[in-house]
Every structure is written in C-alpha cells, then in structure tokens.
C-alpha cells in the first residue's frame, strides 16, 4: 500500500497518487507521454533507458515493468543505457568525457532529448519511491 491514500482520478496507481492535484497529474501525464513517444530518439530506445533507470531509482512499481533487454540494443541504445548508468552513479555531475562519447554518436537535439527524458523519468521514479508505490 502506498504511503498516502489513492485519489479516484487517473488510470494507473501512479496517477491515482498524483491525482490529488488534477492539474499536476494532467500536465505530468502530458509531458510524460510526449517524452516517451517517437522524437529524435525512438520510443524503443527510451523504454530501455527507462528500464535501466528503474533498477536504480528505488521505485518498486517501476522495476516491476521489466529489466533492460540487452538483446534488443542497437548502438544508440547501448550508448544511451550506458549514459543512464553513469547518471545513476553521479547524478547531474556528468564528466565532460562522457558527454564527448555522446557527441560522437548523437546530435545536440538527441542529447537534449535524452537528458530531458532521463531527468523526467527519474523524477517520476523518485515520486513512486517516495510514495511507496508497489507493483
């Protein structure tokens, strides 16, 4: 059971917790949906990054959606997942050498999208962890 009562708003247990504030839930959902869809980076790549982050961000609900699937990785996915692993260890203090590796494969637009996705996904997973959200 979560640490607070679920609201009646939302379609998922996560949304039920955010649903205590309808506007926050709606905007959170909109941003999450936009970041997860196809953009400069594929939704498949982002799902593998999300799964990687879930293993380190403490949200049991998020972990239950699956571990990364290395057999599905292409080069960009491998680099993105590696970057997410570095982020989990050092948080925002990413060394320039790591960004240099990203710049060898990704455009500035792709790096911006990847970092935004990682930051938003981490915030979502931290919220789930703080609320004690279970699978």
What is each of the regions a protein language model found here?
Residues 1-135:
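Hydrophobic alpha-helical segments
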């Amino acid at each position: 059971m979560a640490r607070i009562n679920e609201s009646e708003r939302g379609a998922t247990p996560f949304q039920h917790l955010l649903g205590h504030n309808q506007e926050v839930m709606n905007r959170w959902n909109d941003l999450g949906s936009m970041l997860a869809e196809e953009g400069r980076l594929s939704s498949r790549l982002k799902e593998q990054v999300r799964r990687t982050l879930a293993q380190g961000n403490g949200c049991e609900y998020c972990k239950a959606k699956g571990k990364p699937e290395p057999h599905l990785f292409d080069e960009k996915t491998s680099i993105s997942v590696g970057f997410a692993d570095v982020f989990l260890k050092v948080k925002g203090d990413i060394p320039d050498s790591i960004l240099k590796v990203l710049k060898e494969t990704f455009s500035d637009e792709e790096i911006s999208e990847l970092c935004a996705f990682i930051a938003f996904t981490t915030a979502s997973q931290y919220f789930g962890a703080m609320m004690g959200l279970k699978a």
